[in-house]
Amino acid sequence: MTVRIRRYSDNDLGAIACNARAYPRMRLYVAEFQGGVRGFILWTEKSGFRQDVVLELEQVAVAAAYRKRGIGEALVVQSLPDVAKELAARSAALRAVIVSTRADNDAQRLYRKTLGAEIEAKVQSLYSADEVLMVARNPLGARQR
């Protein structure tokens, strides 16, 4: 038996779309502002088939010309309840959110403010600098404090 492993192509979408729709592990949201898409956020589910779900805030980005206007905060605050609602629809519950970032990245303030995330680990020289792992154990309640 020979199994060929290759990179995914757009032609493969039909073969995997059913699985992706039945169990979406990634959720991508965009921020529209002043007539265009100015940012996005990508949430990735890390829990396999467990009912207690850990999400990773995989990426949040805002176009440079539109930063410092609250778009990043809006992306987190407005998309996370929607993700939690989707989880609840399949009888799953959001347990925590994890996010990693450079130890000197100002985005840590955003993660503390919007998620209640705190640094739980620091990894020396992971990429080009030190990286921190932040965990939010009550992410939906962070803004209610």
Model-derived segments and their meaning:
Residues V53, D130-V132:
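Residues on conserved beta-strands of the protein kinase catalytic domain
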Residues R67, R90-Q108, Q124-D130, R137:
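Conserved beta-strand-loop-alpha-helix junction that forms the acyl-donor binding cleft
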Residues R50, A63-V77, A103-R109, K113:
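Conserved glycine-rich acetyl-CoA-binding loop
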Residues A74-R95:
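Conserved acyl-CoA
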Residues V3, R7-E58, A63, V76, ...:
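Acetyl-CoA-dependent GNAT
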Residues M1-N11, N138-R145:
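Conserved N-terminal entry element of GNAT/NAT acetyltransferase domains
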Residues E32-Q34, A136-P139:
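Active-site beta-strand termini and strand-to-loop segments that position acidic
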Residues Y111-K122:
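Conserved acetyl-CoA-binding loop of GNAT-fold acetyltransferases
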